[in-house]
């Protein structure tokens, strides 16, 4: 008869009594339905049993102070914590209840006499989180339907809802009658709806966003309640059994009990089948009774599961939607965890990865249970979100707050104001602003753009480099080093490290230019013309957009000078440095100074001919230093000579004001981008001791590098903005949810206050009417 009421996928029922766990095949029409019987720890009573999500493993716990795992074929998978392992995770307590997480079987929670809720990682056999707050024995624990919260009840009548994201107590409630709470069940579909029951027979329906029960059935049972649960198919249907030999079903929509079924023995446990109408109850004399709540209030069948002296302490059905595992070819770990191990439900990730990174370490216990991750210099954590313009690879992910950041969150709502740390403060605290880093750049190309990760830490390891290097160079770098001087003036083009020839970035020689060392040795000994001594930089490191734009625009009228180079340098500098106009505005002021400050300006005697001539150029903020001696100015001349070479046909006598120079460069840059690219590709000759060398291969390489630079910057920026937009969207949504939750709580409180005010007003109106009536009677008598 039972074969018509259950499906093959969840036909097995686990039951515990005394120190034994038994599995029953309720679909068997004849013969012994018990398919397996085992004793986890002889002599130790079993208090709770649960099926995992694959329907292949049963977890049980009790007075043996551990969680035992058994496959349905009778094979033991060990215990948690591991027997004999001295890792500080020993339970050292009698466990009353266990519960798997809703999304998978890797994590299981437990509670008992230790007054602490523990979350165990069954893959690593370790306790990864401890949730405190109770002051008495914990009798029930359970995850909510979204694995966001974990509720627990205790003998002291406390109901605590723990936030798994922060580890904080989201809600602390107390039974209104002060009864001993022993039972707890969460709704299968509502995140904040749960039911509790205890020793005085009262059943409470709670909305955990409020401060009091949403609904109560006071002393429904005349003896302690032994079991309570929601219907899996309809959260408005609740069932409970008690030691008064009664089984009640409730309809929360009508606020009353809908049926009552009596039995010959006291009940001791209860479980709903996944179809929503098969109800199984255990009794104190070892029986397991099956009911169909749609039919007559009589048992469908009764199993003699245990002896008459043993209570059926716990019941658990298999799930109707198990995680599919190939039973012909699977390991013990697959039987326990499934074919794929789910992400951590202890700390939800704002941007979860589809596959765990190889550089991530396993989750370690901590104050917030955050999975510690290590970010290598050659690889960054990836996110599956991709932009349609960035199909070639994943983007660097935005990181939320890590475990070492201190803040308390009641509902795990991510806030961009609270959770995102300041980049400048972070760099100062790590000492990066005092580090000499301008000469060599070994960072990967994904770190060349600060906008892709600004405001987010790259991981818990503070020793890793940060993209702040690309836009905030050190003020204490060596000014006498010509390479340091030129490496402070940057370009958007990703440049290879001068010390890393096997870098993944394209080296300058691949673009058609010479190595930095060769060019430096060649140009350091050249003599410079003094025809432009009236033009000078305000300091030794004044390689700013002023110099770049002036050197390009001064020779724009000459047919022999490659105009596109100056424009390209100005465009590149403008793209990377938003405040380039602040530096370029100093040109007019500097041009009016006397020629005694700088006898010759080598920067303007020779134009830069190719982007490959210099390894890396970065902009330096040191623009205020003045020269005090003639020797210092001469050394400055040598510092600038390594990146400068003049086109042979350029006319050095053309002079323009700073405003004209900027206007002309900007007009060429904005109005003729195609011409700039074409000119840059075809008119950038390589100089070697005054000789002109040019080839078709060099032109193609330069054109390819320019297009690659623009596309790389555009796609990286678009991908970063897309990820940031998604993050902001999630933050706003979470904020709206939090606002609604707070509004609901205040609404409940205000409704109670208003109802009490209305009651007082009604009483006062009655008294007023009585007084008027008495007043009229007195007037009539007088």
UniProtKB/Swiss-Prot annotation:
Its main location: nucleus. InterPro entries: NEDD1, WD40/YVTN_repeat-like_dom_sf, WD40_repeat_dom_sf, WD40_rpt. Keywords: Centromere, Chromosome, Coiled coil, Cytoplasm, Cytoskeleton, Kinetochore, Nucleus, Repeat, WD repeat. Disruption phenotype: Lethal when homozygous. Compromised asymmetric mitotic division in dividing microspores resulting in abortion of gametogenesis. One of its GO terms (cellular component) is kinetochore microtubule. Expressed in root meristematic cells. It comes from the Eukaryota. Residues 753-782 form a coiled coil. GO terms for biological process: cell plate assembly; embryo sac development; pollen development; positive regulation of cytokinesis; regulation of microtubule nucleation; regulation of mitotic spindle organization; regulation of phragmoplast microtubule organization. One of its GO terms (molecular function) is gamma-tubulin complex binding. Residues 350-393, 467-512 are annotated as: Disordered. Pfam families: WD40. Gene3D superfamilies: YVTN repeat-like/Quinoprotein amine dehydrogenase. Residues 352-362, 370-386, 488-498 have a biased composition (Polar residues). It is found in: Nucleus envelope; Chromosome, Centromere, Kinetochore; Cytoplasm, Cytoskeleton, Phragmoplast; Cytoplasm, Cytoskeleton, Microtubule organizing center. Regulates microtubules organization in a centrosome-independent manner. Required for the spindle to be positioned correctly and for the function of gamma-tubulin in organizing phragmoplast microtubules. Component of active gamma-tubulin ring complexes (gamma-TuRCs) associated with cortical microtubules in interphase cells. Mediates gamma-TuRC recruitment to the nucleation sites and is important for determining the ratio of branched to parallel nucleation. May mediate the localization of GCP2 and GCP3 to the nuclear envelope. PANTHER family: PROTEIN NEDD1. This is Protein NEDD1. The lineage of its organism: Eukaryota, Viridiplantae, Streptophyta, Embryophyta, Tracheophyta.
């Amino acid at each position: 008869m039972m074969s018509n009421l259950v499906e093959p996928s969840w036909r097995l029922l686990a039951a515990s009594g005394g120190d034994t766990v038994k599995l029953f095949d309720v679909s068997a029409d004849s013969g012994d339905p018990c398919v397996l019987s085992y004793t986890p720890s002889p002599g130790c009573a079993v208090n709770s049993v649960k099926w995992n999500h694959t329907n292949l493993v049963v977890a049980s716990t009790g007075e043996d102070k551990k969680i035992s795992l058994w496959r349905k074929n009778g094979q033991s998978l060990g215990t948690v914590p591991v027997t004999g392992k001295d890792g500080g995770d020993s339970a050292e307590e009698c466990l009353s209840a266990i519960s798997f997480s809703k999304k998978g079987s890797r994590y299981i929670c437990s509670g008992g006499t230790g007054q602490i809720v523990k979350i165990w990682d069954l893959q690593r056999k370790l306790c990864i989180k401890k949730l405190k707050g109770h002051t008495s024995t914990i009798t029930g624990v359970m995850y909510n339907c979204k694995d966001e919260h974990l509720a627990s009840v205790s003998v002291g009548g406390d109901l605590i809802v723990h936030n798994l994201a922060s580890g904080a107590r989201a809600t602390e409630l107390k039974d209104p009658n002060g009864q001993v709470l022993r039972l707890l069940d969460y709704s299968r579909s509502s995140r904040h709806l749960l039911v509790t029951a205890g020793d005085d027979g009262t059943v409470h329906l709670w909305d955990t966003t409020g401060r009091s029960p949403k609904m109560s059935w006071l002393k429904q049972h005349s003896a302690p309640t032994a079991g309570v649960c929601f219907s899996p198919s309809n959260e408005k249907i609740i069932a409970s059994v008690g030691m008064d030999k009664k089984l009640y079903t409730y309809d929360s929509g009508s606020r009353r009990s809908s049926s009552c079924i009596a039995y010959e023995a006291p009940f001791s446990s209860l479980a709903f089948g996944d179809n929503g109408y098969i109800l199984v109850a255990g009794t104190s004399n070892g029986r397991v009774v099956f009911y169909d709540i749609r039919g007559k209030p009589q048992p469908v069948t009764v199993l003699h599961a245990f002896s008459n002296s043993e209570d059926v302490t716990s019941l658990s059905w298999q799930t109707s939607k198990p995680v599919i595992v190939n039973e012909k070819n699977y390991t013990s770990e697959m039987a326990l965890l499934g074919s794929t191990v789910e992400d951590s439900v202890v700390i939800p990730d704002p941007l979860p990865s589809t596959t765990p990174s190889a550089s991530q370490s396993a989750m370690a216990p901590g104050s917030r249970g955050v999975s510690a991750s290590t970010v290598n210099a050659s690889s960054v954590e990836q996110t599956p979100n991709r932009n349609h313009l960035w199909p070639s690879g994943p983007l660097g992910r935005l990181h939320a707050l890590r475990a070492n950041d201190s803040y308390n969150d009641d509902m795990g709502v991510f806030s961009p104001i609270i959770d995102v740390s300041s980049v400048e403060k972070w760099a100062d605290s790590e000492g990066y602003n005092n580090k000499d880093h301008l000469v060599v750049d070994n960072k990967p190309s994904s770190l060349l753009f600060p906008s892709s990760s600004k405001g987010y830490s790259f991981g818990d390891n503070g020793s890793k480099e940060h993209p702040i290097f690309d836009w905030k160079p050190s003020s204490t770098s060596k000014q006498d080093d010509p390479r340091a001087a030129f490496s402070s003036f940057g370009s958007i083009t990703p440049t290879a490290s001068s010390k890393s020839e096997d870098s993944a970035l394209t080296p300058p020689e691949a673009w058609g230019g010479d190595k930095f060392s060769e060019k430096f040795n060649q140009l350091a000994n050249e003599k410079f013309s003094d025809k432009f001594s009236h033009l000078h930089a305000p300091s030794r490191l004044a390689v700013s957009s002023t110099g770049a734009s002036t050197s390009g625009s001064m020779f724009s009228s000459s047919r022999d000078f490659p105009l596109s180079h100056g424009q390209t340098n100005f465009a590149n500098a403008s793209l990377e440095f938003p405040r380039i106009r602040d530096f370029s505005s100093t040109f007019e002021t500097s041009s009016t100074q006397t020629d005694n400050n700088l006898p010759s300006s080598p920067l303007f005697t020779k134009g830069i001919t190719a982007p490959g001539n210099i390894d890396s150029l970065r902009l330096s903020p040191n623009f205020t230093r003045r020269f005090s001696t003639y020797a210092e100015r001469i050394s400055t001349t040598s510092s600038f000579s390594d990146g400068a070479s003049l086109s042979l046909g350029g006319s050095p006598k053309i002079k323009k004001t700073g405003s004209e120079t900027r206007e002309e460069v900007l007009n060429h840059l904005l109005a003729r981008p195609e011409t700039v690219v074409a000119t840059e590709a075809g008119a950038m000759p390589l100089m070697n001791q005054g000789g002109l060398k040019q080839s078709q291969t060099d032109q193609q390489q330069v054109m390819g590098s320019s297009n690659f630079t623009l596309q790389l910057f555009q796609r990286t920026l678009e991908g970063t903005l897309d990820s940031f937009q998604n993050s902001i969207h999630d933050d706003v949504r979470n904020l709206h949810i939090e606002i609604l939750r707070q509004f609901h709580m205040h609404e409940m409180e205000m409704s109670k206050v208003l109802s009490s005010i209305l009651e007082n007003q009604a009483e006062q109106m009655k008294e007023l009417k009585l007084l008027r009536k008495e007043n009229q009677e007195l007037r009539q008598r007088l």
